[in-house]
């Protein structure tokens, strides 16, 4: 094949374009490398800090203790998920004076808690007595906030959705609304329960423009909800000795213990893992 010939001007232009593309590609590769190194650096720093504290600088809460089995289970979960993001749950079961919002951490004070989820409403009319104060404290201390509605399976989904919307004013940077479903209805069929849950979700989604997060226990999800809410963010509670909350399902959050001991809180709390980095968690929040 005869080689195509170019004028000097055209050849020079082609050469310049190739150089531009070459240097552009180098810049892209360099940027990717820098981001990867930063991510690796953060992970290594977290790992080194965690293991150093675990062996040489153990934190012991003055009031709270777990059984050896539970302590080892929690320690293993933390060790296996140092690249993920941690948070906690609170409600009226925690007293206001029990929480020192300035310094909240786990893992021998090496893992900061980045988000907090709090119960806002329950059923048709109830609201958590500490919600408003906890909500403001979380914002004041730059924690990512989440509010959940405890769904009462035999009550009206429209009234329950309105109860949540009247009591919760989500803002930019907050997690999407969270629906907590744990109970089986006594006066409704399971089919009717699913229909009602979808009504609640539809009303709340139309208000905020985001699909609610579905929170439930692993076995409840497997037995009643699986296949019905596949396109919703999933928050599973599983307190067993397992590597993930579900062997079969993708999950976004895992509530892995109800016996969490936190530096800065004088009662045990539920602890949660977000299945990703803090950056990706912020992408999940409301605009």
Predicted stretch roles:
Residues 72-77, 82-99, 108-197, 205-207:
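Substrate-binding cleft of extracellular glycoside hydrolase catalytic domains
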Residues 19-22, 46-64:
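Membrane-proximal basic amphipathic "stem/tether" segments
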Residues 125, 154, 221, 243, ...:
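Flexible, glycine-rich phosphate/dinucleotide-binding loops
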Residues 57-94, 99, 229-287:
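Functionally critical loop-and-helix segments that line ligand-binding/catalytic clefts
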Residues 104:
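ATP-dependent carboxylate-activation loops
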Residues 176-248:
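Catalytic domains of cell-wall/extracellular-matrix polysaccharide-remodeling enzymes
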Residues 26-47:
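Hydrophobic membrane-insertion alpha-helices, especially the h-region
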Residues 1-25:
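N-terminal Lys/Arg-rich, disordered targeting/topogenic segments
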């Amino acid at each position: 094949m005869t080689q195509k010939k170019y004028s000097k001007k055209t050849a020079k232009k082609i050469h310049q374009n190739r150089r531009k593309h070459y240097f552009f590609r180098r810049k892209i590769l360099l940027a990717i490398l820098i981001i990867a190194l930063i991510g690796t650096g953060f992970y290594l720093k977290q790992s080194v800090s965690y293991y150093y504290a675990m062996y040489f600088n153990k934190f012991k809460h003055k009031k709270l203790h777990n059984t050896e089995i539970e302590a080892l289970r929690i320690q293993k979960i933390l060790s296996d998920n140092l690249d993920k993001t941690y948070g906690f749950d609170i409600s009226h079961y925690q007293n206001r004076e029990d929480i020192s919002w300035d310094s909240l951490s786990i893992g021998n004070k090496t893992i900061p808690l980045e988000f907090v989820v709090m119960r806002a409403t329950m059923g048709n009319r109830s609201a958590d007595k500490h919600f408003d104060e906890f909500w403001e404290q979380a914002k004041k201390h730059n924690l990512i906030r989440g509010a959940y509605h405890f769904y009462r399976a035999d009550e009206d989904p429209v009234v329950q959705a309105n109860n949540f919307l009247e009591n919760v004013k989500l803002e930019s940077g907050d997690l999407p609304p969270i629906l907590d479903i744990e109970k089986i209805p006594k006066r409704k069929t399971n089919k009717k329960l699913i229909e009602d849950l979808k009504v609640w979700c539809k009303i709340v989604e139309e208000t905020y423009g985001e699909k609610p997060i579905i929170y439930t226990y692993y076995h409840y999800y497997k037995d009643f909800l699986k296949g019905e809410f596949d396109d919703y963010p999933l928050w599973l509670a599983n307190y067993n000795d397992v590597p993930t909350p579900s062997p079969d399902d993708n999950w976004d959050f895992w509530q892995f213990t109800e016996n969490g001991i936190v530096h800065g809180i004088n009662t045990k709390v539920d602890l949660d893992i977000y299945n990703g980095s803090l950056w990706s968690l912020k992408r999940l929040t409301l605009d």
